[in-house]
């Protein structure tokens, strides 16, 4: 398989490794990106890749709560100029209120529901597109429920570039639930705790760490012990309750939650545009296109 400059660039972005190392890794693994990451890690060249998806598309996240129900959604636009537009911000609030009140199962069902004036949600969004002049997309949403004995934690970072919704069970301390949401926004854990990590993922990490230790020339008799120690650090990176609490690093998130008399039932974290590839236009051209379009 031909190794392209774009593939090398992507691997460099994901691992921080040098260009020649990335090219060699891709060549050795026949262009398989995931295997190339493992190859670099096993050689000790790259740290554990936080396979963060490239954040590209624009828009906002938004959170709406009403009693024991809460909703988090993401509405995309083509540019961040539009995301700051009053019409866009009014639309996201209207959609949030509708979705929380009507609880559709998914985006497809939501688009067919009737909103104000007998229009469908899809028609309502299309009207906003006609006024604003950009493609707008209701990308995703999630509705979460709790009891009177629980608390929601809602946090929007940078005006909605990242949105996090948490549920603290057995405690009505909304401030604590929000503090956990702020931690999640900053650190981006993949799981609540170790039990949520699949056996396959743990075994894969164990194999990579074992090969890494052997390549470092460590004696086989101490490799297993080293690997278990490094696995602990792996869990700290991806499991929320194992992480040092951002607001008090001397305490784990688990200890903070327990000190409030609750348990963390779940969380949802949206970052605008994660996983969406954006057309890489020249920025000056993008601005000129907008100026021309406004004439």
From Swiss-Prot:
Q: Where is this region: Involved in Mg(2+) ion dislocation from EF-Tu?
A: 79-82
**GO molecular function terms attached to this record:** translation elongation factor activity
Chain ranges passing through the membrane? none
Q: Do the record's keywords include tRNA-binding?
A: no
Entries under InterPro entries matching the protein: EF-Ts_dimer_sf (IPR036402), Transl_elong_EFTs/EF1B (IPR001816), Transl_elong_EFTs/EF1B_dimer (IPR014039), Transl_elong_Ts_CS (IPR018101), UBA-like_sf (IPR009060)
> What GO CC terms are in its UniProt record?
cytoplasm
| SUPFAM superfamilies noted in UniProt | Elongation factor Ts (EF-Ts), dimerisation domain, UBA-like
Domain of life, per UniProt, equals Bacteria
Which keywords does the record carry? Cytoplasm, Elongation factor, Protein biosynthesis
This molecule's function is given as: Associates with the EF-Tu.GDP complex and induces the exchange of GDP to GTP. It remains bound to the aminoacyl-tRNA.EF-Tu.GTP complex up to the GTP hydrolysis stage on the ribosome.
The similarity annotation says: Belongs to the EF-Ts family.
Q: What is this protein called?
A: Elongation factor Ts
Which species expresses this protein natively? Answer: Bacillus cereus (strain G9842)
Q: Lineage, please?
A: Bacteria, Bacillati, Bacillota, Bacilli, Bacillales
């Amino acid at each position: 398989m031909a190794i392209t400059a774009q593939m090398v660039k992507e691997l460099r972005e994901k691992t921080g490794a040098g260009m020649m190392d990335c090219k060699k890794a891709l060549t050795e693994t026949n262009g398989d990106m995931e295997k190339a990451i493992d190859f670099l890690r096993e050689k000790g060249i790259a740290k554990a890749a936080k396979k963060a998806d490239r954040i590209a598309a624009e828009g906002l996240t938004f959170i709406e709560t009403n009693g024991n129900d809460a909703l988090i959604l993401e509405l995309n636009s083509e540019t961040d100029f539009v995301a700051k537009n009053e019409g866009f911000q009014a639309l996201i609030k209207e959609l949030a209120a509708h979705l929380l009140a009507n609880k559709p199962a998914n985006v497809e069902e939501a688009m067919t529901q009737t909103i104000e004036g007998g229009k469908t949600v899809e028609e309502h969004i299309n009207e906003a597109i006609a006024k604003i002049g950009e493609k707008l997309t209701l990308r995703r949403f999630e509705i979460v429920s709790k009891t009177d004995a629980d608390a929601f934690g809602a946090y929007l970072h940078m005006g909605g570039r990242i949105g996090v919704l948490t549920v603290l069970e057995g405690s009505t301390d909304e401030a604590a639930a929000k503090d956990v949401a702020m931690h999640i926004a900053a650190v981006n854990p993949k799981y609540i705790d170790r039990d949520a990590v699949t056996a396959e993922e743990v075994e894969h990490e164990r194999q990579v760490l074992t090969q890494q230790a052997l390549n470092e020339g460590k004696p086989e008799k101490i490799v297993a012990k080293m690997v278990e120690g490094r696995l602990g650090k792996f869990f700290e990176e991806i499991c929320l309750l194992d992480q040092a609490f951002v607001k008090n690093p001397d305490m784990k998130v688990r200890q903070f939650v327990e000190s409030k008399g609750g348990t963390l039932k779940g969380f949802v974290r949206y970052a605008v545009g994660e996983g969406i590839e954006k057309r890489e236009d020249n920025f000056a051209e993008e601005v000129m296109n907008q100026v021309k379009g406004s004439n």
